[in-house]
C-alpha cells in the first residue's frame, strides 16, 4: 500500500511539472514578427547558460554548465534532437588549496567558437572558453578569492569535438586579501576575418584595486589559433558604472557588441557598442561615443525595469537582439533575474549604417510564463538559416530551445 501511494505521488509530481508554452508578440504594430513554435527541453536534469553555434560540418553544438562542469552536446538534425550519447565534458571543476583554505573552482558561463576551415594555423579547431569561479568545497559560498582568482580558461578540440585538450588558464584576475565576488566574467569567443581569435569578457579587476565597483569589457587575442594570448585591452567602459556580458557579431566591415550597462540611478539595460574591424578597439568606446548607442526604437533604459544579459546574432536578412526583462512591478525590488522573461527584437540588416542602428522592434517572448513564479534567463540565439532562429533559454533551471521564424507582416 505504501509503495502504491509513493508511486502515485511520483506520477502526480511528474504530471504537475510546469511545462512552458510558446510565447508571442508584444508589439502588434510592428511590420515584422517572429512566429514561435513550442518550447523543447534539451537537458533533462538541470543545466544553465546554454549557447548554440553551427559547426563547419553543419551540426549544431550546444555548450552549457551543469554540476560545476562545462559540457557540450551535438545535434545532427537542426536541433530537433540532442542525443545523450553526444555529450562531452570539455572543462571540469577542480579544487585548490593554500594557507587560506580550500576552494572548489566551478565552471560557469561557457561559450565556444569553431575556427574557419581556412584558418591559417588551426582550421576547424573548436575553442571552448569557461569562467572558473572559486567557491567553498560544498558549493554554497562563492568568492573564495583568497585561495584562487576568478579566471578565464580554454580547452580546444581538433577533431570536431570528439576529444579535448587539458584546460589552460589564459586570463586571471587577482587573488585578493579578502574573499569577494570580484573578478572576470562571461567569456565570448570570436574569429576575425584574418584569423585572429578574440575572447571578450567583463572585468572588475583594475577598478576594485582602486576601491571602485566599475567594470569594463576587455578583449584578449590570439594570432596563432589559441596557443598564445595577448594582454587584455579595454573595449568599452561607460565612465560611471558597469559594462557587462558581451556578445559580438560581425556585419559588413564592423564589429558590433551587445552589452548590458548601468549608470547611477538606472537598472541594467542593453546597448550596443561598435568599431570597425580595421580599428579593432584601439581606443575604448566610452560613455559619450557615437558608437555606443541604444539599438531599439524605444530605449529600455529605466530606473525601475531590469533588462540585462543581452545576446545578438544576424540571420540572412535581420539583426536579432535578445535580453532578459523583469517588468512585473512598479517596485524595482521585484524586477530582477528571479522574475525575468526572455524578450527578442529584430530589425533589417539594411537599417545598420555608419556603425549604428536604432530600429530594433517587434518585441516578442519565445516562452510565455508567469514571471512571479517562473524565469527564462541567461538566454542566447542561434541562426538556422532562411531567417529561422533558435531561442535558447535556462527556463526554471532547465535548458530549453524554441524555434522561431522571422516574417514580414502582411
Identify the meaning behind each predicted range:
Residues 14-15:
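C-terminal motif of bacterial Sec signal peptides marking the signal peptidase cleavage site
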Residues 8-9, 293:
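Intrinsically disordered, low-complexity regions
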Residues 24-410:
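Asp-box/BNR beta-propeller blade signature and adjacent active/binding-site loops
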Residues 1-8:
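Sec-dependent signal peptide recognition
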Residues 19-23:
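Ser/Thr/Gly/Pro-rich low-complexity, disordered linker/stalk segments of secreted
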Amino acid at each position: 500500500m505504501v509503495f502504491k501511494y509513493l508511486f502515485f505521488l511520483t506520477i502526480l509530481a511528474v504530471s504537475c511539472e510546469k511545462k512552458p508554452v510558446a510565447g508571442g508578440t508584444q508589439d502588434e504594430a510592428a511590420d515584422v514578427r517572429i512566429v514561435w513554435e513550442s518550447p523543447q527541453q534539451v537537458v533533462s536534469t538541470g543545466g544553465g547558460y546554454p549557447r548554440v553555434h553551427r559547426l563547419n560540418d553543419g551540426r549544431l553544438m550546444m555548450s552549457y554548465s551543469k554540476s560545476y562542469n562545462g559540457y557540450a552536446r551535438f545535434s545532427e538534425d537542426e536541433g530537433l534532437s540532442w542525443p545523450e550519447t553526444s555529450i562531452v565534458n570539455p572543462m571540469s571543476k577542480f579544487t585548490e588549496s593554500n594557507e587560506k583554505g580550500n576552494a572548489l573552482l566551478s565552471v560557469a558561463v561557457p561559450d565556444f567558437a569553431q575556427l574557419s576551415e581556412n584558418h591559417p594555423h588551426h582550421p576547424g579547431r573548436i575553442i571552448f572558453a569557461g569562467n572558473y569561479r572559486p567557491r567553498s568545497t560544498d558549493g554554497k559560498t562563492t568568492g573564495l578569492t583568497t585561495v584562487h582568482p576568478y579566471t578565464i580558461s580554454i580547452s580546444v578540440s581538433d577533431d570536431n569535438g570528439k576529444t579535448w585538450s587539458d584546460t589552460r588558464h589564459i586570463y586571471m584576475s587577482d587573488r585578493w586579501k579578502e574573499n569577494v565576488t570580484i573578478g572576470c566574467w562571461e567569456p565570448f569567443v570570436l574569429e576575425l576575418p584574418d584569423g585572429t581569435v578574440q575572447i571578450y569578457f567583463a572585468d572588475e579587476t583594475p577598478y576594485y584595486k582602486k576601491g571602485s565597483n566599475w567594470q569594463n569589457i576587455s578583449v584578449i587575442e590570439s594570432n596563432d589559433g589559441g596557443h598564445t594570448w595577448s594582454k587584455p585591452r579595454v573595449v568599452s567602459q561607460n565612465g560611471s558604472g558597469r559594462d557587462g556580458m558581451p556578445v559580438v557579431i560581425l556585419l559588413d566591415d564592423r564589429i558590433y557588441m551587445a552589452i548590458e550597462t548601468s549608470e547611477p540611478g538606472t537598472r541594467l539595460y542593453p546597448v550596443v557598442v561598435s568599431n570597425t574591424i580595421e580599428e579593432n578597439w584601439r581606443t575604448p568606446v566610452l560613455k559619450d561615443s557615437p558608437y555606443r548607442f541604444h539599438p531599439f526604437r524605444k530605449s529600455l533604459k529605466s530606473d525601475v525595469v531590469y533588462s540585462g544579459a543581452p545576446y545578438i546574432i544576424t540571420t540572412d536578412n535581420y539583426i536579432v537582439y535578445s535580453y532578459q526583462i523583469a517588468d512585473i512591478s512598479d517596485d524595482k525590488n521585484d524586477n530582477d533575474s528571479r522574475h525575468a522573461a526572455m524578450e527578442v527584437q529584430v530589425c533589417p540588416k539594411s537599417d545598420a549604417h555608419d556603425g549604428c542602428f536604432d530600429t530594433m522592434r517587434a518585441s516578442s517572448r519565445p516562452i510565455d510564463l508567469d514571471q512571479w513564479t517562473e524565469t527564462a534567463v541567461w538566454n542566447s540565439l542561434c541562426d538556422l538559416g532562411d531567417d529561422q532562429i533558435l531561442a535558447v533559454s535556462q527556463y526554471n533551471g532547465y535548458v530549453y530551445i524554441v524555434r522561431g521564424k522571422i516574417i514580414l507582416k502582411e
